[in-house]
Amino acid sequence: MNLRRKNRLWVVCAVLAGLALTTALVLYALRANIDLFYTPGEILYGKRETQQLPAVGQRLRVGGMVMPGSVRRDPDSLKVNFSLYDAEGSVTVSYEGILPDLFREGQGVVVQGTLEKGNHVLAHEVLAKHDENYTPPEVEKAMQENHRRPQRADKDTSS
């Protein structure tokens, strides 16, 4: 091997090592912001593809429906406990804070938090889902008022 090829080999190796180091540092920095999405059934039985269960203490997002009759509010604080369910099972959730206006039983929600023992999620954030047809009540009222039928022009209103 001549000197020119050796220099090229060293440059290529240095560039590859630099890329590997950069990738490792980026992944290390982002690990605190990576939250995997699970459904209640996937927490209980694992992801469909890998059958891998989330670890206790893992940060995650859980999406499901609020089980009717499961919402329990602490009268002395903002603590709320409820169950999320899907077709495969349910998990319990604890949250302390103000819930979104759209939060109610039977409604779809996404909670972000950490998995505790016993399939319990300690939520740090609760997001209520709504469908694409949602209209705020104020807008609905305004639309109803604006779309009233006009009075007939041939009707005599003076008598």
UniProtKB/Swiss-Prot annotation:
The lineage of its organism: Bacteria, Pseudomonadati, Pseudomonadota, Gammaproteobacteria, Enterobacterales. HAMAP family: CcmE. SUPFAM superfamilies: Heme chaperone CcmE (SSF82093). It holds the Pfam family CcmE. This is Cytochrome c-type biogenesis protein CcmE. It comes from the Bacteria. GO terms for molecular function: heme binding; metal ion binding. The gene is ccmE1. Belongs to the CcmE/CycJ family. Residues 1-8 are cytoplasmic. Its main location: membrane. Residues 30-159 are periplasmic. The keyword Ribonucleoprotein does not apply. One of its GO terms (biological process) is cytochrome complex assembly. GO terms for cellular component: plasma membrane. Residues 129-159 are annotated as: Disordered. The chain crosses the membrane at residues 9-29. Heme chaperone required for the biogenesis of c-type cytochromes. Transiently binds heme delivered by CcmC and transfers the heme to apo-cytochromes in a process facilitated by CcmF and CcmH. It is a single-pass type II membrane protein. InterPro entries: CcmE, CcmE-like_sf, NA-bd_OB-fold.
